[in-house]
Amino acid sequence: MLEDEFGREVSGVRVSLTDRCNFDCVYCHNEGLGDTRGPMDPQDDEMSTDDVVRFLEVVSQFDIGKVKFTGGEPMLRDDLTEIIRRTPSSMEVSMTTNGTFLPGRAGALREAGLERVNVSQDALDPDEFAEITKSGAYDRVLEGVEAAVDAGLAPVKLNMVVFEHTAEYVEDMVNHVSENAGLQLQLIEYMPELTGHPEWNIDIQRVHDWLADIADRVETREMHDRNRYFVGDGMVEIVDPVENPTFCANCHRVRVTHEGYLKGCLNRNDDLRSMGEMTREEIRETFRETVANRVPYYGEYLIKENDEWVLNDKYLDAPTTHS
């Protein structure tokens, strides 16, 4: 298994299959690339089926044991089932989706090798859900969650971004998963540095404190040193990467954009490495370089000076590698 100079082993990859999406969520940062949502028709710049599989076969040789397929909306890829079926058997396969295409397809994806899904569900109120996602697909998402559970993809993890628009629904969502053994809840801190609108931000520590008070028990997950709050039949965890050196120090993933760029850090786009028409050996070496050049964003790339996060001087002249 490869590790960077900070001792962080890379055990998983997060692969964006498309930047297309049938939602237009107000908080979306498109896997750290910003608001670059593409048109709905298939695009020539998306990695092909063979591109994705070749990359996964190469990195599996480094004991990469997990792959999460993301988007955009990955279920807009007509070849998604084939990609999952051809993923190396040594890898645990999961996917993040808005859930609208799961009805009628969840079973086939499970048979192809998909093991888990995260479904975006930011509110249990249809009107607020429509306002956040710019879609009227609330009922379809609920059907998708049910289809995933029925297909054996449980526990289904519901993703909820916590910000001004959704904060009042956190308690409802926690109660919802506490009453449904097939569901878990992942509360995701809003990232204004990637999406703008800092006025939408809330203090995520208040949510931690509230959950600690109501939880039946609290456990700490090794990855990201993250707390898990068990409430009734459900489990809730918080993803809070903003200004969080602990989160960065425990990051074990490399990302791949839909165009085939290796991306060592969610927050950075100055370290992209294109796989383009590379051979397998070239992909191996480029992946090695990407891992070797990873640095914790908070605590290394950015450092605290006078209570402000500033760019570490040693990275001021860092080369930009987009090709």
UniProtKB/Swiss-Prot annotation:
[4Fe-4S] cluster 1 binds at C21, C25, C28. InterPro entries: Aldolase_TIM, Elp3/MiaA/NifB-like_rSAM, MoaA_arc, MoaA_NifB_PqqE_Fe-S-bd_CS, MoaA_twitch, MoCo_biosynth_MoaA/MoaC, rSAM. Its EC number is 4.1.99.22. Binds 2 [4Fe-4S] clusters. Binds 1 [4Fe-4S] cluster coordinated with 3 cysteines and an exchangeable S-adenosyl-L-methionine and 1 [4Fe-4S] cluster coordinated with 3 cysteines and the GTP-derived substrate. It is an enzyme of class 4 (lyase). Catalyzes the cyclization of GTP to (8S)-3',8-cyclo-7,8-dihydroguanosine 5'-triphosphate. This is Probable GTP 3',8-cyclase. It comes from Haloquadratum walsbyi (strain DSM 16790 / HBSQ001).
